[in-house]
């Protein structure tokens, strides 16, 4: 089994994008990436942040440099920005489904060769074709361009058939907008349901950003209380989350390791703060006891039900939940008892039937025996009568 750890690099630090640091050393790569920023670039960031006219087409340039004495093949791919379960924006390809509100997917408006071959100790410019939609709109089309060395997986360790491999990649963010108009943020709560994260039971609250703008500096307070069982209460507070434009993600509320999900009715209460501002009208006390001011606040309340079969299924897969030995499960004992009773009842019916058949056979034998005795007596009488006549 392979465990791939994606390391996202080359996304610069800016409040509209977030912070992604270089977590691997340069010697992990056999090539370097340098975006050539065009004249319509907004700001001095190290990624593409373009202002374009409706319908405008443009070719971007990214310089790749092979720093080794061997040929390096680099795979290239474009992806739309998404939000992962940790409340972090991802710019690289992943399995997260596009949100229903995403009207302009970057994949449909940008293209790049699938791969490029870099000769030893050489540089090469890669061209990226981008086109702005013809319709006028406010907001941003967000995504990223990923560069990964082909077959670049590096095995760290092997043990009993398990190989842990790291896959390193450069990711250059690509933002496209028609103007600098601010998009008023919005946040919706779509659904609440039990699920699992890393084979541990959680209750997922799906949050959706339906607008074409980033939701930045999000602080979330969430609590799930049992309505069927008032003793049940689970909390999950997180700070400094971010959501990509037109995206959604599952915010997990852990029920704690070793705890079983219980069937019944529940209520989720959630408060989300967004965009720090010292003059903001909404106050949040952070984990350090310090007051934080925000421009936006959303409050959600939603009731939901966990079915018994759903709870049982998830509990059986939770690696932290102690599994009840079969001999301690009263349902198994009840089942065995019912089977024994059924077998006893069946045996009793068969025994009664067989006994009845035997009694009927004995009765027939007695009747036959009586008939034979009667015939014998009749014959004997007839013989005696004949002797008298003689």
Pin down the residues of each PLM region.
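Terminal connector regions
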Residues: 72-94, 131-179, 260-317
